[in-house]
UniProtKB/Swiss-Prot annotation:
NCBIfam families: PRK05298.1 (NF003673), uvrb (TIGR00631). Keywords: ATP-binding, Cytoplasm, DNA damage, DNA excision, DNA repair, Excision nuclease, Nucleotide-binding, SOS response. It comes from Caldanaerobacter subterraneus subsp. tengcongensis (strain DSM 15242 / JCM 11007 / NBRC 100824 / MB4). This is UvrABC system protein B. The UvrABC repair system catalyzes the recognition and processing of DNA lesions. A damage recognition complex composed of 2 UvrA and 2 UvrB subunits scans DNA for abnormalities. Upon binding of the UvrA(2)B(2) complex to a putative damaged site, the DNA wraps around one UvrB monomer. DNA wrap is dependent on ATP binding by UvrB and probably causes local melting of the DNA helix, facilitating insertion of UvrB beta-hairpin between the DNA strands. Then UvrB probes one DNA strand for the presence of a lesion.
Length: 662
């Protein structure tokens, strides 16, 4: 397979060419860390695509959540239709990790709902890395979580060609060894079926195609790719590589060694717990682990096999797990998108996992080796990366300290400049704001207002309504889908002013917004830090008449730095426009490609359980609401709450079935 082929109607413009050139040159010189400081709307993704095409290396793009990763994945797929653009995020729709709460003696079993489509995409991503070099994998931070041994994964691959001497039973045995399940009736992903001398395999990385292997005696006669639904032959293959159905698949020899090693650890830990006087814990561990060992012996697999991954891969205690990073070749390139958010996330993954496992190990639910099924620490992540380009409009201290060069991309292809920032006193701020809203709305534009507290946002919203202004309040209790609809309505002009507390997380790139008002701008804190202020100011940068008004009595250090940086960028942009005769134009964007809500997990909502529902729609919406709360509780390690919510959901599902049968 050749290199990357970038397909686009656009050519790099503004300062994109110099950014591409400098970063490509930096990689070639061997710079380990570089930063692309690109303002909102300057085409950072297009710049990344051009760098990938020029360097021709396997590339990992890390985003800070699934939604942002999905957005980048679809953009890169458009830029590289002929190359392998893959998607690697957590495959859980819902995940309640295994936990133990000593205070109430409550053990919560792992409960998860796996998204089959995402699991298929994960397998497709790892398989692509062993088959070709023109690979881009867009991943969330879950790429630093443990995965099986890449050497095993490659060695266990079943490679078949027509004319090869392979007996039918040998192929079947090999498929079972790499975790494929024989099922002649229900033919789904990760299964195979046998009909006489024909074996059909549904690879883990395929979604609607399967492989048909036709044998003649002990020889492979033909290999065809077939449509799973119709059985129609889509084409014949000269070679097929079938990768394991699980990333934790391993050879029988390794499994036998792992079983011996687990048993040794069990005996040692059992003795240790007994000596500490923890009789109940010792017996619990003995029973649970022996059950898992029997499953491994007979089936080659057990529930929670990832907790034994250190034994299976033969790693020493305390050693880092294998992750997606280990599947890449040595010369791979990493882009960390929105690095000011992603880097702190990568730093925090290990500690949260460790604190949950401590109770499980201490109380005899797991062996101490379960600690080694974990995400990488940040230091281990740093050791595994080859060359990194951080991408952000507001790079954090880590990126600025480590980068061997910071390349700025300040010119927008549309000629738009950063908005003018005005500071006004707090006294009379509401009356002044109303006057500014009326002026802006009269021109057909919209307004964003950001406050510090929920109470203030609600009061302001009520007051503006009384003054005859069409306003909506965007708060954390609103679900993602409804939020998308609210922003769509704002763009369509169904209302003119949107009030919120944190307008950063929404991905609110709305061209119709010509005014952003920041109330209490001088109250230092997370929402009024330099980074947050610059990001908020950027919300007005999609409109040629964009302005930002900060209401403050004193100018804080954060405000001063944010205003100075905005004015510096604005000056460079205006000089560029004047030199090249460019007139800024407001972005014209169809309302259907509206926004990208970049926050997957919502804040919790209050839920009071009502006795009985009789309306199926009400039950369904309540289940959806509870599932959202349950996921959030699991993320925040509130396992008892998540377990209670799960039980409520199960109860409501039963009720839904009963109502449907009436």
């Amino acid at each position: 397979m050749g290199g990357f082929k970038l397909v686009s109607n656009f050519k790099p413009t503004g300062d994109q060419p110099q950014a591409i050139e400098k970063l490509v040159e930096g990689v070639r010189r061997g710079y380990r860390y570089q930063t692309l400081l690109g303002v909102t709307g300057s085409g950072k993704t297009f710049t990344m695509a051009n760098i990938i095409a020029r360097l021709n290396r396997p590339t990992l793009v890390i985003a800070h959540n699934k939604t942002l990763a999905a957005q980048l994945y679809s953009e890169f797929k458009e830029f590289f239709p002929e190359n392998a653009v893959e998607y690697f995020v957590s495959y859980y729709d819902y995940y309640q990790p295994e936990a133990y709460v000593p205070e109430t003696d409550t053990y919560i079993e792992k409960d998860a709902s796996i998204n089959e489509e995402i699991d298929k995409l994960r397998h497709s991503a790892t398989a692509a890395l062993f088959e070709r070099r023109d690979v881009i994998i867009v991943a969330s931070v879950s790429c630093i979580y443990g995965l099986g041994d890449p050497i095993d994964y490659e060695n266990l691959m079943l490679s078949l060609r027509p004319g090869m001497v392979k007996d039918r039973d040998e192929i079947i045995r090999k498929l079972v060894e790499i975790q494929y399940e024989r099922n002649d009736i229900n033919f789904t992903r990760g299964k195979f079926r046998v009909r006489g001398d024909v074996i059909e395999v549904f690879p883990a990385s395929f979604s609607n195609k399967a492989i048909r292997i036709e044998l003649f005696g002990d020889e492979i006669d033909r290999i065809a790719e077939i449509d799973v639904l119709t059985g129609e032959v889509l084409g014949y293959r000269k070679h097929v590589a079938i990768f394991p159905a699980s990333h934790y698949a391993t050879s029988r020899d390794k499994l036998e060694r792992a079983i011996k090693s687990i048993r040794e650890e069990l005996e040692e830990r059992y003795k240790e717990l007994k000596e500490m006087g923890k009789i109940v814990e010792a017996e619990r561990l003995w029973q649970r682990t022996n059950y898992d060992l029997e499953m491994l012996q007979e089936m080659g697999y057990c529930k929670g096999i990832e907790n034994y991954s250190r034994h299976i891969s033969g790693r020493p205690p305390g050693s880092p797990p294998y992750t997606l990073l280990d599947y890449f070749p040595e010369d791979f390139l990493i882009f960390i998108d929105e690095s000011h958010v992603t880097i702190p996330q990568l730093r925090g993954m290990y500690n949260g996992d460790r604190s949950r496992k401590e109770a499980l190990v201490e109380y005899g639910f797991r062996l101490p080796s379960a600690y080694d099924n974990r995400p990488l620490t940040f230091e281990e992540f740093e050791q595994r990366v080859n060359q990194v380009i951080f991408v952000s409009a507001t790079p954090g201290p880590y990126e600025m300290e480590h980068s061997e060069q910071v390349v700025e991309q300040l010119i927008r292809p549309t000629g738009l400049v950063d908005p003018e920032v005005i500071v006004r006193p707090v006294k009379g701020q509401v009356d002044d704001l109303i006057a500014e809203i009326r002026k802006t709305v009269a021109k057909g534009y919209r307004v964003l207002v950001t406050t510090l507290t929920k109470k203030m946002a609600e009061d302001l919203s009520d007051y503006l309504k009384e003054m005859g202004i069409r306003v909506r309040y965007l708060h954390s209790d609103i679900e993602t889908i409804e939020r998308v609809e609210i922003i769509r309505d704002l763009r369509l002009g169904k209302f003119d002013v949107l009030i919120g507390i944190n307008l950063l997380r929404e991905g609110l790139d709305i061209p119709e917004v010509a005014l952003v008002a920041i109330l209490d701008a001088d109250k230092e804190g997370f929402l009024r830090s330099e980074t947050s202020l610059i990001q908020t100011i950027g919300r007005a940068a999609r409109n040629a008449e964009g302005r930002v008004i900060m209401y403050a009595d004193t100018i804080t250090n954060s405000m001063r730095r944010a205003i100075d940086e905005t004015n510096r960028r604005r000056k460079i942009q205006m000089e560029y426009n004047e030199k090249h005769g460019i007139v800024p134009k407001t972005v014209v964007k169809g309302v259907r490609d509206v926004i990208q809500a970049t926050q997957v997990a919502e804040k919790e909502e209050k839920y009071e359980k009502t006795a009985n529902f009789y309306d199926p729609d009400v039950i369904k919406s309540t289940i959806e609401q509870l599932e959202k709360e349950m996921r959030q509780a699991a993320i925040e390690l509130q396992f008892e709450k998540a377990a209670k919510l799960r039980d409520m959901i199960l109860e409501l599902r039963k009720q839904l079935e009963e109502v449907s049968l009436r």
